From Swiss-Prot:
It comes from the Bacteria. Pfam families: Hydrolase_3 (PF08282). PROSITE patterns: COF_1 (PS01228), COF_2 (PS01229). Its cofactor is Mg(2+). The active site is at D8. It is an enzyme of class 3 (hydrolase). Keywords: Hydrolase, Magnesium, Metal-binding. This is HMP-PP phosphatase. Mg(2+) binds at D8, D10, D212. It catalyses: 4-amino-2-methyl-5-(diphosphooxymethyl)pyrimidine + H2O = 4-amino-2-methyl-5-(phosphooxymethyl)pyrimidine + phosphate + H(+). InterPro entries: Cof (IPR000150), HAD-like_sf (IPR036412), HAD-SF_hydro_IIB (IPR006379), HAD_sf (IPR023214), HMP-PP_phosphatase (IPR023938). Its EC number is 3.6.1.-.
Length: 273
């Protein structure tokens, strides 16, 4: 039996309205009652996640900011990584050939120089919001990650620029088709979950994980059982063909799988609804 379950949020636990469905909530509570440690592994900020979990009546370990921070259920930090100050300065001062908006995340919040209220729709439950700033007003240290937001094709072109200029100095991943992230080198959900597992005297083989995007790849590929959402990015499905595909987030596919696993863990699972 798996002793820890790690869940991505957007496109996995959350439905298209950015909320956790009632069937999913029920399944998560059943899982916790069965003695399985809940872990939420997401690109979202710690403050955002605490609001979501409080609203939902859930508790668990948190891997946030795409693994730049790991906290226990009480919010105590267990592990963290920041971008090097010189890299932050380089990203902010380089005139990239793009119309993408840029967003910087720190312990004290989400910062941007572009006011786009539409981005707040995904954070209605928690009330988490960006803070408008001038980039030269922020410290160059203590920064978790950058996000660039634009159309996918524009971000593909930007990623090529970033990789050419910063090859080997940072990691890049698509947490959504319209969101490109710049992360500390070697920072991913697989590494973070391994550190958390060690803290809990577990191994990755003791874990199951659910995800839908490229920032979930390392986590899904390294755990004892990785489950790919039906709505996952095509690239993720292509790169992890050995993993089982379950239902879609809008169908509360995670709950469907968990109910099956809790009641009939040794039977073959079918994602049909």
């Amino acid at each position: 039996m798996y002793r820890l379950a790690a869940f991505d949020m957007d496109g996995t636990l959350l439905m298209r309205d950015h909320k956790i469905g009632s069937i999913t909530l029920n399944a998560l509570h059943q899982l916790a009652d069965a003695g399985v440690t809940l872990t939420f592994a997401t690109g979202r900020h710690y403050l955002d996640m605490k609001g979501i979990l409080s609203h939902s009546g859930l508790n668990g370990y948190l891997i946030t900011g795409n693994s730049t921070r790991v906290c226990d259920a009480e919010g105590n930090p267990l592990y963290g990584m920041d971008l090097p100050a010189e890299l932050v300065e380089f990203v902010l001062r380089t005139p990239w050939q793009t119309n993408a908006s840029i967003h910087l995340f720190r312990d004290d919040g989400w910062f941007t120089d572009r006011n786009d209220p539409d981005l707040l729709i995904a954070h209605t439950t928690s009330g988490f919001h960006f803070q408008l700033t001038e980039w030269d007003e922020l410290p160059l240290t203590g920064n978790h990650k950058f996000c660039f937001i634009a159309s996918h094709q524009e971000l593909v072109e930007l990623k090529a620029q970033l990789e050419q200029q910063m090859s080997g100095e940072a990691d890049f991943c698509f947490s959504a088709t319209d969101c490109l992230e710049v992360l500390p080198r070697g920072c991913n959900k697989g590494v973070a979950l391994e550190k958390l597992s060690h803290h809990l005297d577990l191994t990755l083989a003791d874990c199951m994980a659910f995800g839908d995007a490229m920032n979930d790849k390392e986590m899904l590929s390294r755990v004892g059982r990785g489950l790919v959402m039906g709505n996952a990015l095509p690239q993720l499905k292509q790169e992890l063909p050995q993993l089982q595909i379950i239902g879609r987030c809008e169908q509360q596919g995670v709950a469907h799988y968990l109910h099956h696993w809790l009641s009939s863990p040794h039977l073959t699972y079918s994602p049909e609804f």
